[in-house]
Amino acid sequence: MSFVIATFYHFVKLSNYYDMKDEIKAACDNFELKGTILLAEEGINATISGERNAINKIFNFLCSDYRLKDLTWKESAAKYQPFSKMKVRLKREIVNLGVSNLDTSLRGKYIDPDHWDDFISQPDVLVIDTRNEYEVKLGKFKNAINPYIQYFREFPQWAKSFSKNKNLKVAMYCTGGIRCEKSTAYMKSLGFNDVYHLKGGILSYLERTHNKNGNWEGECFVFDDRIAINSSLAPSNKIKCIFCSNQVSADELKSVSRGQVVCSDCNPS
């Protein structure tokens, strides 16, 4: 049996997000889906997995709410179910930047994955990776600036220190698009004018371009039991245990915390 992993988000005002939780959870359970959906007043953010027909059903169910008809939606395949349960959670933010009253509608301009390579090759463009340090270690775009943050909520402090460059053209990216979209809104609030971000993130870029120009270097960390994927969107075979340094497959995985992987031999309990 194969599974479809769907990752999606949308920044939109959901004033009744408290009331949406039970209905969405019931639909996911009915379709036998696993994963996590986050709801907040600022929108929805999720990664779920299930059979093809079930994913189609939840997509149609969510899009029946006019506020969710423009979901940023990406899919990949897995040979096993990467999640153990289905969770729908209420949050203050769907991605934790820690900035109150940020108007996410004032985000930067999208760059389509097919045009990303040409755009970032321009000499006056600074490329910024908005992900955490342990993610950047696995892979990044060539010449991208690494803010060396441990948590996304540390990004605002770094951005303020970078504000002397506010007259430059900035291109930002993340895994699936949500962090770079929110961070562009924050950069614009600091006075950056020429701000852009990769539509759909690294995952859409790899899916659309197959990394034909080799601008993506390394693996891409993902937040499920696959741990990381390669440029072909297949589970990576280059993840190593932090204790024995042996490569770790999904079957051998014992635990993972913020990119720190432990194999079953080193943690048999």
From Swiss-Prot:
PANTHER family: RHODANESE-LIKE DOMAIN-CONTAINING PROTEIN 7-RELATED, THIOSULFATE SULFURTRANSFERASE/RHODANESE-LIKE DOMAIN-CONTAINING PROTEIN 2
Superkingdom of this protein's organism: Bacteria
GO biological process, one term: tRNA modification
Family: Belongs to the TrhO family.
Active site: C174 (cysteine persulfide intermediate)
Function: Catalyzes oxygen-dependent 5-hydroxyuridine (ho5U) modification at position 34 in tRNAs.
GO molecular function: oxidoreductase activity, acting on paired donors, with incorporation or reduction of molecular oxygen
Name of the protein described by the UniProt record: tRNA uridine(34) hydroxylase
Disulfide linkage: none
Rhodanese domain sequence ranges: 121-214
Gene name in the database record: trhO
